[in-house]
Amino acid sequence: MSRAIESVAVIGTGTMGSGIAAASAAAGCRVLMLDLTEEAVDRALGQIDDEHRHLVDTGTIEDDLGKISGYDWVCEAIVEDLDVKRELFVRLEELRKEGSVISSNTSGIPLRQISEGMPARFLEDVAITHFFNPVRVMKLFELVPGEDTSDEVIDAFASFGANQLQKGVVHAKDTVNFIGNRIGCFFMLSGLHLAKPFLADGMNQETVDAVLSAPVGLPPTGLYGLIDLIGLDVMELVGKNLAVNLPDGDTGHAYTEFPAAEQAMHDRGQLGRKAGGGFARQTKLDDGSRHKETFDLTTQDWRDAQAIDLEGVPSDLGEVLFEDSPAGSLA
């Protein structure tokens, strides 16, 4: 039988879960948003446009998990911890309705690990549905089947992603970090290490971000700005996942841990935008303007953000890679 997705239950209402819920509501679906606390769900409701609020029901995982039985797609979007995910999926499988589809928004944990020991119905109905942050803006939607996932389930997810959510669906294999994050996380984690000599030679972090953005075909956030958006807590979990799952001899093993300065930031809760600042922060002044600051990795202190001067740096990828300059060497 064909599977139609007309309603979506999202478990976990953090940055990604709230984004998936908002996109689904905007597509006209009934949406259920559940998290550990009512406060977390209330914050996430701010992502839902007023015109779509009537489509959204909310609750807590402890009190309202049974509500998922009324939804076509059950989407897990909780913390990147395999044991926690597996524990939740056992509960979800007991409660979801026959004919529903179920997925994880994990950014890189293999589906075979999530599915280990689960019943046949789960194995046939489960997939990875990996969205990218921010969900409303990013077109990429990775769809990863398990060994036993049925074709009709994959077709349902692909159709919903392309037609209702207007995403570009990329079919990926069940390998660590799939496609996007296998490339992107290597860039970010290795970039933290490989930028160190340039910082030591006097290049500031703003210039690192500027070079590692438009000139090399990457988002304007650059390196540090992108990690600020994702969060150092998420990146640390990604690194641990890579350390366990990368093949022996893979170059990525050299970069699965943070450099010392970035690890210290993580340990004191300086995680990024969601924590009030990571590598950068903004403060609203009395006159309404914003004061931008950068956390200097060399001095380990906040300073005023510096203007960027990329005069003479080529904007074409092929040229900047071979530019005889610090910017070219960094790229």
Residue ranges and their predicted role:
Residues 1-331:
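N-terminal glycine-rich phosphate-binding loop for ADP-containing cofactors
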